[in-house]
Amino acid sequence: MTDQAAATSADRRELISFRVGEQEYCVDIMAVREIRGWSPATTLPQSPGYMRGVINLRGAVLPIMDLACRLGMPVIEPTVRSVFIVVKAGDRTVGLLVDAVSDILSINDDMIQPTPDVACDAVRSFVRGIISIEGRMISEISLDRILPEREAMAA
């Protein structure tokens, strides 16, 4: 393998893409622990509006975040196609409620374009960049920014 080919393959990352409403988003696949079908969450009083509640995942309490609500999109009730993607960023593990998982993408970092200024500040702060691939525009979510701090999850 040439040095250039080795560098190119080393720069590649895999992302998992999913739908929230009519939009497509993705996260780094290395942060994904599992994907589970939707099951109702137990709501917690005084929790932020984007937190659906908690579920029991093999004996551990897992907070479930409604990604549509967190992104400022209209909230719709989950359907049979809805899933939650269990992700881990740092010491935080959360289930992200999404409408459906779409695809596994393999990209180079130079394929990521900056979020345009037309997006609202909340979305721009949560989105790492935009990936144009196979005729689709996919926003990469920054888990470090979108996941609430532990205090906010417990509030």
Swiss-Prot record:
InterPro entries associated with the record: CheW, CheW-like_dom_sf, CheW-lke_dom
SS bonds (residue pairs): none
Keywords: Chemotaxis, Cytoplasm, Nucleotide-binding
CheW-like domain boundaries: 12-152
Example of a GO MF term: nucleotide binding
GO cellular-component term (any): cytosol
GO biological-process terms attached to the record: chemotaxis; signal transduction
PANTHER family tied to this protein: CHEMOTAXIS PROTEIN CHEW, CHEMOTAXIS SENSOR HISTIDINE KINASE-RELATED
Protein name: Chemotaxis protein CheW
Gene: cheW
